[in-house]
């Protein structure tokens, strides 16, 4: 039951076959074909110069190919499958525990698959497909060009995603940088960054970043820089950064192109909106709640809703509703409701209700209700006035406490 054909070929396994110079078939039912080929495992096949199949029912095809693991498969020059069920396909590809010497390699590398030049899958249930990928995290996989994965349960689909130590994560795209041994991250896009403290980060876009836990960045160049913050839109920024000096800016939300929410629980919605302090709300294109970053976040609570509402304002406890309402105003406790209401005010606790009401005021505690009411009130005796009606109380410099009607 032995067949040996070739110079110095030997066939010692039951029903084994050796064909070629210095071939050796020592495993039962094994086949060795090629110069120096060796089939030692039962039912194994070695095909190619210096090919070696040591594991039971293993297959080695190619020059200097080696299969050590039981039921393992190696195909390609220098390929090596060294653990049970491992598959290595491609030039110098490696699947399984590289230190294994026999077909019983243990847990590491079992059911590993490596396909591609220099690909390595060296942990249990791993997949490495592509040139130079190295996967050593249990249950992880890399598909594409050189990426190294050491974290467990992590997959990378794309090229040049560096070394990923994060566990239970997914990276889909190219040139992404996942720093540190984080977990639960999801990245879709190119050239994105997840910092070392950012567990459970979500990025969808290009050139975006998350630098704190549970952050979300969606959109080109979006950035989530504080815990639980959400940035949605081109160049959107949510979190403590870009000059903010107080607070942690947790749970901030910025939605819209160039929007910025830099305070704790701040909300900025709309193109170019800015909510720079804690619990501030800015809604509407270019709406703002104050640019002064030298005052403690805890002292500033502003709300601006409307196109350019509160833009250029400086103060605290102000509320502006309407297009251009409260624009370029300075002071505390002011309220303006209506188109351009309360615009260019310097003073405190003023109230303007109606289109163009309460504009250009340099005084405090005035109330203007109606179209154009309470415009151009000055501090020279012009405080604490009430103007009700269209055009009422314009250009007032009268005594304190007047009630002015048209």
Q: Residue locations for each model-derived region?
A:
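Glycine- and small/polar-enriched repetitive beta-structure motifs of secreted/surface proteins
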Residues: 1-406
């Amino acid at each position: 039951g032995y067949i040996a054909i070739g110079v110095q070929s030997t066939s010692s396994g039951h029903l084994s076959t050796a064909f070629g110079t210095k071939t050796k078939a020592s495993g039962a039912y094994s086949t060795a074909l090629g110069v120096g080929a060796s089939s030692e495992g039962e039912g194994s096949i070695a095909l190619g110069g210096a090919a070696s199949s040591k594991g039971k029912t293993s297959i080695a095809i190619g020059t200097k190919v080696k299969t050590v693991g039981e039921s393992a498969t190696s195909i390609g020059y220098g390929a090596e499958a060294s653990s049970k069920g491992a598959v290595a396909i491609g030039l110098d590809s490696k699947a399984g525990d590289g230190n294994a010497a026999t077909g019983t390699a243990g847990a590491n590398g079992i059911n590993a698959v490596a396909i591609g030049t220099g690909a390595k899958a060296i942990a249990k249930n791993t997949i490495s497909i592509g040139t130079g990928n190295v996967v050593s995290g249990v249950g992880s996989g890399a598909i594409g060009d050189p990426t190294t994965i050491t974290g467990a349960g992590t997959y990378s689909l794309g090229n040049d995603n560096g070394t990923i130590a994060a566990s239970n994560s997914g990276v889909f795209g190219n040139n992404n940088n996942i720093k540190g041994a984080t977990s639960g991250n999801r990245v879709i896009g190119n050239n994105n960054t997840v910092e070392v403290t950012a567990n459970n980060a979500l990025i969808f876009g290009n050139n975006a970043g998350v630098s704190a836990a549970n952050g979300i960045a969606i959109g080109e160049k979006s950035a989530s820089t504080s815990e639980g913050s959400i940035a949605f839109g081109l160049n959107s920024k949510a979190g403590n950064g870009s000059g903010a000096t107080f607070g942690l800016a947790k749970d901030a939300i910025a939605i819209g192109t160039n929007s910025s929410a830099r305070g704790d629980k701040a909300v900025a919605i709309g193109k170019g909106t800015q909510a720079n302090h804690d619990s501030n709300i800015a809604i509407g294109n270019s709406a703002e709640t104050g640019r002064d970053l030298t005052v403690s976040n805890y002292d500033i609570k502003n709300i601006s809703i409307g196109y350019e509402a509160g833009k250029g304002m400086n103060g605290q406890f102000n509320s502006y509703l309407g297009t251009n309402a409260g624009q370029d105003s300075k002071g505390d406790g002011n309220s303006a409701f209506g188109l351009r209401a309360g615009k260019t005010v310097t003073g405190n606790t003023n109230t303007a209700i109606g289109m163009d009401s309460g504009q250009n005021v340099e005084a405090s505690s005035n109330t203007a209700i109606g179209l154009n009411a309470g415009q151009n009130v000055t501090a020279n005796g012009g405080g604490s006035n009430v103007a009700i009606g269209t055009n009422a109380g314009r250009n007032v410099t009268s005594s304190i406490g007047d009630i002015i009607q048209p």
